[in-house]
Curated annotation (Swiss-Prot):
The modification Phosphoserine is found at residue 36. Residues 28-213 are cytoplasmic. It comes from Rattus norvegicus. May participate in suppression of cell proliferation and induces apoptotic cell death through activation of interleukin-1-beta converting enzyme (ICE)-like proteases. The chain crosses the membrane at residues 7-27. This is Receptor-binding cancer antigen expressed on SiSo cells.
Amino acid sequence: MAITQFRLFKVCTCLATVLSFLKRLICRSGRGRKLSGDQITLPTTVDYSSVPKQTDVEEWTSWDEDAPTSVKIEGGTGNAAAQQNSLEQLEPDYFKDMTPTIRKTQKIVIKKREPLSFGVPDGSTGFSSRLAATQDMPFIHQSSELGDLDTWQENSNAWEEEEDAAWQAEEVLRQQKIADREKRAAEQQRKKMEKEAQRLLKKEQNKMGVKLS
């Protein structure tokens, strides 16, 4: 009886080992199939018939061979000239106000008066006639506008007289200032002497009051 039980145990253990071995094989084959299914296989051959054909490359010098050589515009010159003339007419003249106006200087003629001359009894000479020809002295009036400048005769005596008059006026003013300064100094000296006299008088009065007391 014990021998039969031992044999049954051996058979069961052998079956268990076989089943476990088969189970391991089945698991390994399933895992290998999953890994092989995840991988993507790429084709190793290339079909050149599917590649589009490229056009032949042309040289850049042959690009303008078919282009027109000349372009003719009819009526363009006249329109451009008319448009330019209209633009010139519409453009304002910015320098119109800057052009100077030239005016001639006015001349004032002063007649020289002649002294009265008494004639001799024979009547050869008499009073000077007002209608007689006199020597005219031109006087030029300087205009503020731009104009022609005539020659002007300079009178040296007149300049000297004006300088003498100006020097005399300056001398008179200087003398007057000196006189005013001396007058103020004398007035200050007089006031100072009056104050000194009043002070001495008060001092004497105070002394006399002390003696009487």
